[in-house]
Amino acid sequence: MSILSKKLNKLDHTIPIYSPRTTYKNIRQNDEHLLADLTLNFDPFTINVLKNEFGIRDMQMKLSEFILVVKEHLLSWQVDIPNRETKLVRCLTNLFEEIDLNGNGILEWDEFTNYVIEKATVLNNIKTKVDEIKTYTKSQVKPLQAQTKHLTHKFNNLVTKILYIPHIDRLALYEEGSAEILFMNPETGVMNNKTLKVVPKSLFVTSSTVKKDEEGLIHVETKKNFIDLKTMILDILYIPDKKYQVLLTSSNDKYVRGWKHSSNGWVLASQPDNEEELIEHEFKNEIYCLAWDSLNEILYCGQKNGNIVIWYFKTDTEKELEREGAHTEVIMDMITMPKLQFLASGALDGLLILWDTINNKKKRVYKEHTRGITSLSFNEALILLFSAGFDHEVCVWNPYIDNLIYKISGHSSPLLGVKVIEGTSQVITLDSDGNVRVTDIKKFSNVQCFSVETSDEKHKFNPQCFTYIPKPLKLAFCGRSVQLYEYDKNYNPNYVDDYVAICCAFVPSQLAFYTPAGNKIKLWNALTGDIKKIFSDVTQGEITCFTLDSLKKRMLIGDSMGQIGIYNTYNGAMIKALPKHSAEIIQIIHADAITMFISAAMDNKINMTLDNDFGENELIRTLELKDVMITSLGFDPITKMIIVATNTGITSFYESDTGKQNGSFSELTQYEEITSLNLIKNLPYIITTTTNGKINFIALPPLLFKFQKVFYFKNEDSEQKLLEQQKIQKEGEQQLQQQQTQQINIGSAKGSILNNMGQGKRKQDDQVQQNLSISNCIYCDQTKCLFLSDDKGFIKCFDISQILTILEKSYNNHKDKSNNGAKSFLIPPNFDGVEYQEVWSQRAHYEMIKSLEYIQEENLLITTAYDKKVKLWDSKTGNLIDQLQQNYDKQEPRPIAFKRSGTEEIYDTNLEERIDLKRKSSLKNAKLLVKNEQKGSQTAIKSLSLTDKKLNTQESSTQEQEAAQQPQQNKNEGVQGQGDDLFANFNPNKTYDEEFNPFYFMDKIDKTKLKTDRSNSDWKLHINYIKYFESFEDSIKQLNIDIQKQEHELREKTEKQGINNRRFKVNPYQNSDLNAQKFGVDHKPILKDEINFKQENQDQHKVKADNRIQEGLNQVTNSQATLPRIASLQNNKLKLQNQQQQVQNQQTEPSSNRSHQQPGIETKTLAAISGDQNKKQKKVWDNLYKKELQSKFLFGSNQSEIRLSKEEVDAAHRLAAALANYDKDDYRSLKFYNIQIKESKGPKKLQPLSQSKKK
């Protein structure tokens, strides 16, 4: 049963496998990260070079040209990642699409430079969900007595310090001069009955008394007494490590004690490894400050005299840090940085000292503070250290830098504390006056300021300290009392934002939903429902209008201040601003047919601005309406008319060329507001909706009955209708029961019931007349359906196909120039017998719906409402799919399986059972083998062997497909060429399919063994991502083919011209007139032995070397090869045999066969001398240069023999690969790559390796 693999060890490294949807999300996210890193390479020098490249091509490039050009200037970008070439092409393709905003497939220089400028201006405005900082508000929670739970707990003295203990979810605090620690519930404010009282050991005293008895004898009496001592707490610290979970206290009796929480309260804790030994230590001096190093299990204790003592928990020993040049006054705060192996200490002497925890010596001393330091804090993610003191300022440091980075100012009183909220970009500071400032670390900008005050005006709060509670995030301040401040008090996990989202747009290229709310835009991943990024502070005012251009590459945004801007959908950068209105923006339209932007505002003005990419704003004309208010705006691309709807029920039509009014339609009811406009494709009609619940069909030119209503129907109150029906049915049933109990004639009872039902029906008909106001309406051309939302929060779907059929038939008759259509040309169509059908109706929200969006490709409806929710609906059935939620505690995607690293074995989530298909086949074959052994049948064994052969064939074919992306050996080289290739056995870390195919692992898993095939079961929306994935992959594959073809053509062209296109230098072996040149255009001497090369020999040699160098280079960079690994590969027996055969062939080859060589070239014999195996890798490279190997080949030395060890030859191959990376056609790389390993007994005589081994 050797065919079965061993059980997975817990120490084995495993790789999580996610569902295809989550995997595809990770692939796209990785592409975005690589693209962000790639754009950092656009420094001024690179941009200047690219400008010259653009200039050669008339300042514009196509996609393939852009990739070819930029690739040449990104040779040092991410050279060690697998599948680098493919990733580079993917990134450059995404970059091209991101820059090409007009979608013409051509990248202009203006587009490129504008993108670079945009990228620099929006870095601070792009945030993640964690970066977004909300505000703090005062909580109603206050300290309450434990007995009554409604009376306020009063403290006798100031509360000196407060900290949060997550293990028991309590706030620990103590009063000034007290030896007792109190515990408070942060949710209710109730103080615990059980407290922690620090009681020192009693003092043992022996007293003697002398007495004289009656007889005159003297007696001495001895008594033993215990005196109870009192102490006060100086500092407290909680160790959250699971191994300890101990509360430490330092007191003025020079003791530091550890306390453990139990069911009986707090007791002295013992060492985890020795229960008999208590966590208690007596120091020589009082400890005023404590800091814990969780990595090394060390406690740093700061003393009053400025000394720092180290207490090693494991050995219960102590050690002092060096005193020379250290603190001279009491240490106020210390903070450990275990990952950086630093300790920071701040004291009242104003010094901030950074200690090296490895040798316990000073690393740096910062002297920026002019007065004493009171508090320290550290942000591990950004590697920033913060120090606050009595000089009113917070200094920001980087532990690796000697100088100050930044100063946070704004306080007017001495600072008492500074805290970094872990996992966020917030820094909280508190001063002695109770002023609190919230600062954004990444922008160093003030976010919020508030003051901590007490309800009692007679007494000040006198703040002393503060801490924070992580979940839910709260700030706890202590002074005369305890006050709590809640973060994002109005936070609701089901909301999309604190503000109402005015709409929700879908961008297919990003697979993201855009929800503008307030002055920011949130981007939601359509694959997982998570927030991808946030465009913050987009506008000065609140966003009131949001729409996308025709290509969905630009955002058109208007705000409450009348400002309009065009922004990039990829990065949120502002491209340009449109002419400003004097009031709130209502709607913006991108009229692509006339290349204009049309905007309407509350000032009753309509601006028409030319869409001229990055040029200046060109306002074409302005239309001003009087005595009305614009409610909706539309544009007909066929007639090129601007359609304006107003609050008075008038729909006006204006010519876009002249601005003149062409006609209008008015509702019969005055002030019947028009709420929406919808055009019908290929038909001269529009659909309008009103606040009275009417859906109107209005004719447009060229119809002679233009600007007239040809048909309408009403939006009935479905809820009211249903209630009336239920009411009638209920009343009928009640009357029937009453009549049955009174034994009344059944016939008369039925008659009365029918009579009442008829009355109810008439009442219902009266109710129908009160139609619901329509807030939004969208028409779908393909499904012939009309989707609308009303004021009651309902969304409905109407099938209007019969109405459209009549309109289409009538319009076709109008286009008929015969006499038969002349009569119908003048008369509106007849709708007798035409019915519209309500397909479905659904209660979407319990408040008014703000917007309604329809995504036809995904059969998706999106609603936003004033309840701050965004919901996704199935447009076919009206069922709720999911909703966007700002849930901070949302679970991360869970793996569906695990893969053992370095193998093809795949295990379930419990790491107990293999679930890969290969395992399934192995088990099947193993069972068949056992069965055949029992039967003793040889034929069955043969069939098993055939099955194994098929399995091996499938595995080999799979491996061939996975290796398809690796560089292929030249077929002309044969076996000998493969043996010479030093990098033949290198494999990339990941194959192409493994890295870019989201279904790669799913195709290898036995799906019947999976517990679940979804990594994110919380997200119910199923976007058809396969369509986007296949489309992008097909374009990349075709693009790779085009690029390879162009590179081949370019290579042939440069070879014919003898010019290297990359550095524009002449290669000596490509110049026909070599004898006339002594130096190349790069001012480097030409090799002497290269001058006499024949062209035919050089060409053949170059093709072989090119292929081997490129393959070796790609495989080295993909597998991150090291010299030891190369040496082990070169010691392969097969390679040595091939090299031996090649040497023998060269020795035994007759002179006639070598007559084609030029007489000026001597065949160099490079004998390899076995080197010392214990040499370091660094010496190999040093040896290479010490022997001047490089200079000998570069400048054409005539030395006939150079002796090299195997490690040095390996280094030479690496140098060849590096030279090829610099320049693929560099002749120097050809020379280095041809170095071969040979062993010799004499200076020139070569001996086969096999014979030397025998000796």
From Swiss-Prot:
Biased composition (Low complexity): 953-969
Gene3D superfamilies according to UniProt: YVTN repeat-like/Quinoprotein amine dehydrogenase
Subcellular location: Cell projection, Cilium
Residue segments, region Disordered: 941-988, 1140-1160
Record-linked PROSITE patterns: EF_HAND_1, EF_HAND_2, WD_REPEATS_1, WD_REPEATS_2, WD_REPEATS_REGION
Ranges of the WD repeats in the UniProt entry: 228-269, 282-322, 326-365, 368-407, 410-449, 496-536, 538-577, 580-624, 625-664, 669-708, 769-808, 844-883
Predominant place of localization: other
GO molecular function: calcium ion binding
Composition bias type Polar residues, residue spans: 1148-1160
Keywords on record: Cell projection, Coiled coil, Repeat, WD repeat
Residue ranges annotated for the EF-hand domain, each copy included: 87-122
GO cellular component terms, A-Z: cilium
Top-level taxonomic group: Eukaryota
SUPFAM superfamilies: Quinoprotein alcohol dehydrogenase-like (SSF50998), WD40 repeat-like (SSF50978)
Residues that bind Ca(2+): D100, N102, N104, E111
Oligomer and partners: Associates with components of the nexin-dynein regulatory complex (N-DRC) and the CFAP184:CFAP263 complex.
Function description: Associates with components of the nexin-dynein regulatory complex (N-DRC), a key regulator of ciliary/flagellar motility, and might act as an inner dynein arm (IDA) hub or linkage.
Family: Belongs to the CFAP337 family.
The protein's name in its UniProt record: Cilia- and flagella-associated protein 337 B
